[in-house]
Amino acid sequence: MPIIEYNGRKPDISPNAYVSPLSTLIGDVKVNNDVVIWPGSIIRAENSSINIGEYTTIFDGVMMFTRSQRSSINIGRYCIIETGVTLLGCFMEDYVQIKEGTIIFEEVSIGEGVIIMNHSQVPPGLTIPARTVMRGIPVDSIREQTRNDVLKQKEKAENYSQLFIKIKQQLPNAQSYLLTLPDFVKLMLKKEE
């Protein structure tokens, strides 16, 4: 897993986080407790900081990039960022789910419990109210979530994190925050048996 220092800032990864050896973290990145980062994700904090809150899962091929000093990325707790999402700068509260292939541009504010549906685009500077389900290019509200929906979102995020705790217990050579490639291959072979 490439962890690259940039302008004197090196990624800060909690020993209780799980980061794939096939992901890349650059610069001022903070990965908090129980975060899971899957293979192929690129997290580049070269111009501004990136903070990933507890129990958040970053799926395969996610791209986070701070293009300017005004494009910091803050992801709340219990969030799920699905495969192929691009984040170019946003403030995201807790219990948010960003579905596959979505692009979020700079200076976006996303409220608690929001879901953004597959292949949507969120234009720069948009504020999305809490518990809203959004879809489209550009995004538009399609419905509201209940408090119960948001609690289910939290449970789903916890389940993803707990899955990696179980996996880590099965891997004798796993480091505190890194699943090595040989251990990852062993795990995949074990599942096929």
Feature map (PLM): residue ranges:
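Short proline/glycine- and basic residue-enriched helix-capping loop/turn segments at helix->loop/beta transitions
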Residues: 80
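Glycine-rich hexapeptide-repeat left-handed beta-helix
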Residues: 1-8, 12, 46, 52-54, ...
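A positional/architectural concept
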Residues: 13-67
